[in-house]
Amino acid sequence: MHRRRYFYGAAILLFLTSFIGMLIYGYKTFYIEKELAASEEYRYHFALIAEETDNEYWRLIEEGARKEAAKQNVYLEYVAPQRADNDELLKLFDRMIAAKVDGIIVQGIDGRRFVDLVHKATERRIPVVTVDTDVKSSERKAYVGTDNHHAGELAGKSILENTEGEQFVGIVTGRFDAINQQERIAGLKHILEGNPRIQIVGVKESGITEIGATQATYSLLKEYPQITALVGTSALDGIGMVEGLEEIAPDKDVYITAFDLIPETLDAIEEGKIQATIAQFPEEMGKESVTSLLRLQEKDLLENLIYTETGIIDKDNLPALREGQP
């Protein structure tokens, strides 16, 4: 009797186990097929590889890219290192190539590894568009973004046209190893170094963080108390420079030129704490990058340098910008 009960119990348990297993398998199969069906609705799968995950500037590039991708029925995948890290970015680049995406938008990085990865993507017929920072020596199909040398020149012109007498300039830059930062500093020096009343006294790195810019500004002013003008070459440098100045020399009159149109920088211009910022339009960069990749699915571009708008924003033209006027 006990054996019979044991037999029936084991049979029921086996049946239930098999039944539950079938349900799970059926659900997974259905779920995967549903995911595949959803992915097949898109025309293409593009990857946007940013410098840093939650960087406000890169999120604006993503926003512009996503809007255009949605219009064109393209699936856009946004990936980035948690913090700015070239090695991690290159690993993500390699991973996206292995994933066989239809196109890659990526910040250019100086060095052989980046050039080799672009070549690898090209061999696999995956077009690469650099955004924000170009690497002309690579096989990238196009560059979309600011003419960074020209942007640096605009920062220099802002100082020349709005200051008088002898000026001592301190520079806060995002990363010494970033090509776009190097090009901006080169443009700035091109304008300022030929002028006898201007002297660049020092350059410090912010690590593209606000607190880093604050510390860099503090160090510059401590080392060079004669500084009369500060220039930041990455998005969070402006606010950091204001905080650094307020910390070490709150009553000192310093002409501050920032970079990018993040809300905190625009508010500081309105309050008179920052005198000017060099405007980039990251949403436009994102949009044009997706547009370029779409064209590259059919043929190479005739024009592979796609410069987006750049300009000087100050207290005079800020209201027009806020109202959305050109």
Regions found by a protein language model. Give the residues of each.
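Hydrophobic membrane-insertion alpha-helices, especially the h-region
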Residues: 9-25
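Hydrophobic alpha-helical
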Residues: 106-122, 188, 206-265
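Hydrophobic alpha-helical segments within soluble ligand-binding/sensing domains
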Residues: 144-168, 212-214, 265, 280-298
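Hinge/cleft segment of the Venus flytrap/periplasmic-binding protein
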Residues: 12, 27-28, 284-326
